[in-house]
Amino acid sequence: MLTVPFEEPDMMRESQFGATFTRQEDVRTLSSAELKEAEDDNTDREEEEEREEDENGLPKKKGPRKKKSEGRGDRVKMRRQEANARERSRMHGLNDALESLRKVVPCYSKTQKLSKIETLRLAKNYIWALSETLSAGKRPDLLAFVQTLCKGLSQPTTNLVAGCLQLNARNFLTDHNGDVSFSGRPAYDSLYPYPNAEMATPTGLSSGTRESVKPFRPYNYYASYESYYDSASPESSSPHFDGQMSPPINYNGIFSLKKHDEQVEYSKNCHYGMRYCNVPGRGSMYRVSPDSHFPYDLHPRSQSFQSQDELNTGYHN
């Protein structure tokens, strides 16, 4: 099959678009003035579109972002400073009010400061307890008053309230539910936690368990009583002690222990309870009968003591 050879004009034929715009045509560059005019035209066109949309009730388009001027930045900064000053003044007023409230509620402490929430809780309980007392019209029960006062408070706050009311915080402990539970011990057991001669039950046991507990007897000094007075104590069942007492002993120059032939009349202005001695001019807090003195010669610091030579003489003889 014979074919017609390609002719050069047919191979180099250009399209209609290429015929219209020749390839050798240079690109025209726009000057800066022409660019500015084009931007202004675009801005005007956008503003007109926004006005048309506003008039038609359609959502407004966001226009071009405005540049922050120097005056606008100063105004924003001034508004922020004024808002901070208002917030600071409000917090100062709140703190002053809470400080005044801490001085009114019954747990003011100079060393420990209540938190804001604990102050508000205690103030609420205090107002509620006072309202119940006024509605009852009679003298309130201390335990019930403290129970209402410490409801929902933490243990440190409960300790502060107990210290302010001069109570023992162990008598009313706050559980996890916020309720206050009281122990069965009487009030004097918490004030005087040591056993005395008249108490037949160890300290810390409730009244319900005292019947089932075997009574105990505290330590007494009947043996020393017999060795000193050469006679058996009426309340003691121990045998008589006839042995010779050891040489005089000096305890730091304060107590001198020796054996006398005659009984010494003790001064009546010094009553001994437990381990405390009455100070001249002051009342003793713990008093016992004068007959239960210890068999020791107690010399105040103002009195003179025996010299060491006299003590050594009695020892060598």
UniProtKB/Swiss-Prot annotation:
It is found in: Nucleus. Residues 78-130 form the bHLH domain. It comes from the Eukaryota. CDD domains: bHLH_TS_NeuroD6_ATOH2. InterPro entries: bHLH_dom, bHLH_transcription_factors, HLH_DNA-bd_sf, NeuroD_DUF. GO terms for molecular function: DNA-binding transcription factor activity, RNA polymerase II-specific; E-box binding; protein dimerization activity. Keywords: Developmental protein, Differentiation, DNA-binding, Neurogenesis, Nucleus, Transcription, Transcription regulation. Residues 301-317 have a biased composition (Polar residues). The keyword Nucleus applies. A motif (Nuclear localization signal) lies at residues 65-70. Its main location: nucleus. Disulfide bonds: none annotated. One of its GO terms (cellular component) is nucleus. Residues 59-69 have a biased composition (Basic residues). Residues 1-90, 297-317 are annotated as: Disordered. Differentiation factor required for neurogenesis. Does not act as an upstream activator of isl1. This is Neurogenic differentiation factor 6-B. It comes from Danio rerio. The gene is neurod6b.
